[in-house]
């Protein structure tokens, strides 16, 4: 087996074809710089000449000096009625300013005859002419054998002839593409084993995930000798996506012993994943292997007890190797080990002999039976654990009362309903009313609460707190409009983020609970810093 594999990232080209992914030119430049810092060998930047954005990207990248990565221009073989030297697409690759190009060509006779509408022999000449032309002008030319595995199944000898045509013309690497993503690993292994006997130049793998096998197929090809693996960060790609480099890289490094990236850069894998998610404006996938929030999250009490004693019992790698960390979840499935481990994470003094331990465990189980969920609301969980002790006093105890009232009205002059929230606080007989308008009752309530409280907690940063996310889930749908609901909110202050939760038959009351917890958690964090 190879001791190293070339990482070829196509996030900016194939990944950008994914539904809901839209990179600006600035985004593309930032992603390219991040991938270079991360240690990727090749960065496929797009198809120069096919659209203004990719043209502008390659223009901008002329000003960027990459440390180690090579920028790759992507394109297609020449058109059927043009010479390679006259083809606009091939000329655009040469004019892109980079020295490495990847072009795709037809491997499947069905596509040659029905899509390209030419003869099988002419397709071989198209491949040969295109590769040969680019080799005269560029240092490296990679040939993507589009639909190779489907083509091989339909007409094995012809599919191989397309590879040999590219090889004879000077292609530096023949990339076998499972373009439709339907090939099974056992079929891939059989086909790759056969074609290895016929080709002399290195080969690579480009797998799509339509059968949830892109990573498995990529690893299978590498075990059989592939020297280059194509993929995208987070598996972005058309339809069901491409092979996920965030899964391939740690599998190569930690399980197959293939040194495709440095240890230091491997520890930045989660950071890179989240960085690209942010630029793509997509949520982070909690259940993504290796780097997702749930990848090393433990919920069952027996599992937690075991993993604390020996992480190997329920963790296949050390989370920190990929920049992740273990999370202990507290729920109605929790045992004492969960509570103790979570308390240790939060620096809350708690031991097996602490009387609060049983109190906390019972409270968690009771609240979750009522519909509370603490897995996304660790701010509320920390407050719950502190309230179980005798030394914690809520900051809201200073108020003799803190009430709210909300009015929502639809007026002819307004295109949408507007809400007004009034918060009343009383301290030592002094009563203060504060009101705020908002786009909906919860937005108004949030504004009113944050408007009145800074007066009582000056210098504690409440002015910076913002509601980032708000989710409502109906827990007892059978009861219709009287159903119990759970509100989960995420708040942030520009530096940190935290989640809190509330449950009630009234969505506004559930929201109030979560908002109050959010403010109290912020005040708690600020007090600990000071």
Language model region names:
Residues 3-7, 14-43, 58-66, 79-203, ...:
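Alpha/beta enzyme core
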Residues 17, 27-30, 372-498, 502-507:
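Non-catalytic terminal/interface segments that mediate subunit docking, oligomerization
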Residues 12, 47-48, 75-78, 105-108, ...:
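Short, ordered loop/turn segments at secondary-structure junctions
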Residues 495-530:
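Mixed-charge, glycine-accented linear interaction segment located at domain edges/termini
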Residues 21, 47-51, 120, 149-152, ...:
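Hydrophobic alpha-helical scaffolding
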Residues 4-5, 11, 250, 256-433, ...:
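A mid-to-C-terminal "edge-of-domain" accessory segment
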Residues 207-233:
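Small-aliphatic-rich amphipathic alpha-helix that forms the alpha element of a beta-alpha
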Residues 67-74:
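A glycine-rich helix N-cap at a beta->alpha junction
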């Amino acid at each position: 087996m190879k001791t190293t594999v070339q990482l070829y990232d196509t996030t900016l080209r194939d990944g950008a074809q994914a539904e809901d992914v839209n990179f600006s030119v600035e985004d593309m430049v930032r992603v390219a710089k991040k991938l270079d810092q991360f240690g990727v060998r090749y960065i496929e930047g797009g198809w120069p000449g096919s659209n203004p954005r990719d043209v502008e990207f390659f223009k901008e990248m002329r000003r960027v000096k990459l440390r180690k990565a090579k920028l790759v221009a992507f394109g297609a073989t020449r058109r059927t009625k043009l010479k390679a030297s006259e083809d606009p697409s091939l000329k655009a690759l040469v004019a892109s300013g980079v020295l490495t190009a990847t072009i795709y060509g037809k491997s499947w006779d069905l596509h040659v005859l029905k899509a390209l509408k030419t003869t099988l022999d002419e397709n071989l000449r198209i491949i040969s002419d295109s590769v040969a032309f680019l080799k005269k002008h560029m240092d490296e030319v990679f040939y993507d054998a589009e639909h190779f595995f489907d083509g091989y199944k339909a007409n094995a000898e012809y599919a191989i002839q397309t590879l040999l045509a590219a090889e004879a013309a000077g292609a530096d690497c023949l990339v076998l593409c499972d373009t439709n993503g339907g090939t099974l690993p056992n079929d891939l292994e059989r086909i790759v084993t056969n074609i290895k006997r016929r080709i002399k130049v290195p080969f690579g793998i480009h797998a799509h995930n339509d059968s949830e096998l892109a990573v498995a197929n990529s690893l299978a090809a590498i075990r059989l000798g592939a020297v280059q693996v194509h993929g995208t960060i987070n598996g972005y790609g058309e339809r069901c996506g491409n092979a996920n480099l965030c899964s391939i890289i740690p599998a190569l490094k930690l399980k197959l012993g293939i040194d495709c990236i440095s240890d230091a850069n491997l520890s930045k894998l989660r950071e890179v994943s989240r960085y690209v998610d942010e630029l793509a404006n997509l949520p982070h996938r909690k259940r993504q292997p290796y780097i997702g929030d749930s990848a090393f999250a433990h919920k069952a009490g027996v599992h937690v007890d075991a993993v604390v004693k020996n992480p190997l019992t329920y963790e296949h790698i050390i989370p920190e190797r990929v920049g992740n960390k273990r999370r202990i979840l507290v729920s109605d499935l929790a045992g004492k080990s969960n509570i103790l481990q979570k308390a240790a994470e939060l620096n809350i003094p708690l031991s097996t002999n602490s009387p609060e331990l049983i109190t906390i465990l019972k409270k968690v189980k009771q609240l979750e039976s009522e519909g509370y969920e603490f897995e996304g609301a660790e701010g509320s969980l920390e407050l719950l654990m502190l309230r179980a002790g005798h030394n914690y006093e809520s900051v809201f105890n200073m108020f003799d009362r803190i009430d709210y009232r909300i009015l929502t009205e639809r007026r002819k002059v307004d295109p949408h309903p507007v809400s007004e929230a009034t918060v009343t606080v009383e301290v030592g007989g002094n009563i203060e009313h504060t009101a705020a308008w908002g786009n909906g009752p919860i937005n108004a309530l949030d504004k009113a609460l944050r408007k009145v409280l800074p007066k009582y907690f000056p210098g504690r940063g409440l002015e910076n707190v913002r509601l980032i996310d708000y989710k409502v889930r109906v827990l007892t749908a059978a009861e219709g409009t009287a159903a119990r609901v759970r509100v989960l909110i995420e708040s942030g202050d520009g530096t940190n983020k935290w989640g809190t939760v509330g449950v009630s038959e009234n969505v506004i009351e559930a929201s109030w609970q979560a908002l109050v917890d959010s403010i109290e958690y912020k005040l708690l964090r600020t007090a600990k810093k000071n």
